C-alpha cells in the first residue's frame, strides 16, 4: 500500500482517497481534500497558508532538520524478500518512530521555554506597575484585632462597673 503526500498541505493520502490533477506537461498533483485543491487553484503559496505543514516548518514551529527523516525517503530499489530482513526492518521502523517522537517533543518544549521566560518577565513588570492594586494579606487584620481588643476591654470595664 503506497501512501502519497498531498501537494498542498503535505498530509497523507491513502489509496482510494483524495484527488489527482495532471497538468498538460504530465506533472501530477495529488490533493487530500477539496480545501487543498481549491487553494491550489487560487494559486496560493502553501508556505504562506498557516495551517499547512510547509508553513509550520518554514516558521520554525516543527522540527525540519533531523537524521530520522532520512528513513522516510522513497527507495525505488527492489529487494529480495527475506523474512529476517523484513522483521528487522519493522523493528527498526518502530525504533525510528520512537526516537522521532522524543526529538519532536524535546523541540516543542525548547520552543515553549522561550515563551514561558517572556511571560514571567511580563508578569513581573505588570506586578511592579500595578503594585498599588495588591493589598497586603494582613493589612486589615491589625485593625480588626485592635477593634476586638478595644471591644473586650470595654466589656470587661462594663462587667466591673456592673458588679
From Swiss-Prot:
Q: Which domain of life is it from?
A: Eukaryota
Provide GO CC annotations from the record. Answer: nucleolus; nucleoplasm
The record's Gene3D superfamilies line, in alphabetical order, gives: Ribosomal protein L24e (2.30.170.20)
GO biological process entries: ribosome biogenesis
- Asked if Metal-binding is a keyword of the record, the answer is no
Q: What CDD domains does the entry give?
A: Ribosomal_L24e_L24
The record's annotation in InterPro entries points to: L24e/L24_sf, Ribosomal_eL24, Ribosomal_eL24-rel_arc, Ribosomal_eL24-rel_N, Ribosomal_eL24_CS, TRASH_dom
Which GO terms label this protein's molecular function in UniProt?
Answer: structural constituent of ribosome
Major subcellular location class: nucleus
Keyword Nucleus (UniProt): yes
| PROSITE patterns (UniProt xref) | RIBOSOMAL_L24E (PS01073)
What keywords appear on the UniProt entry?
A: Nucleus, Ribosome biogenesis
Indicate the quaternary assembly: Associated with nucleolar and cytoplasmic pre-60S particles. At the end of biogenesis it dissociates from cytoplasmic pre-60S particles and is likely to be exchanged for its ribosomal homolog, RPL24.
Q: What does this protein do?
A: Involved in the biogenesis of the 60S ribosomal subunit. Ensures the docking of GTPBP4/NOG1 to pre-60S particles.
This chain's protein is named Probable ribosome biogenesis protein RLP24
**Protein source organism:** Mus musculus (Mouse)
Q: What is the lineage of its organism?
A: Eukaryota, Metazoa, Chordata, Craniata, Vertebrata
Amino acid at each position: 500500500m503506497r501512501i502519497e503526500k498531498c501537494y498542498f498541505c503535505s498530509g497523507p493520502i491513502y489509496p482510494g482517497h483524495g484527488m489527482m490533477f495532471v497538468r498538460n506537461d504530465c506533472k501530477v498533483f495529488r490533493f487530500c481534500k477539496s480545501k487543498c485543491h481549491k487553494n491550489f487553484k487560487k494559486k496560493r503559496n502553501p508556505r504562506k497558508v498557516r495551517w499547512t505543514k510547509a508553513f509550520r516548518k518554514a516558521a520554525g514551529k516543527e522540527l525540519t532538520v533531523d537524521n530520522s527523516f532520512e528513513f522516510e525517503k522513497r527507495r525505488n530499489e527492489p529487494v529480495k524478500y527475506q523474512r529476517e530482513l523484513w522483521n528487522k526492518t519493522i523493528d527498526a521502523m518502530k525504533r525510528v518512530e520512537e526516537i522521532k517522537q522524543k526529538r519532536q517533543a524535546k523541540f516543542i518544549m525548547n520552543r515553549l521555554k522561550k515563551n514561558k521566560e517572556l511571560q514571567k518577565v511580563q508578569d513581573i513588570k505588570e506586578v511592579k506597575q500595578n503594585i498599588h492594586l495588591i493589598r497586603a494579606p494582613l493589612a486589615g487584620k491589625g485593625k480588626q484585632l485592635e477593634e476586638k481588643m478595644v471591644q473586650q476591654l470595654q466589656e470587661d470595664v462594663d462587667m466591673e462597673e456592673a458588679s
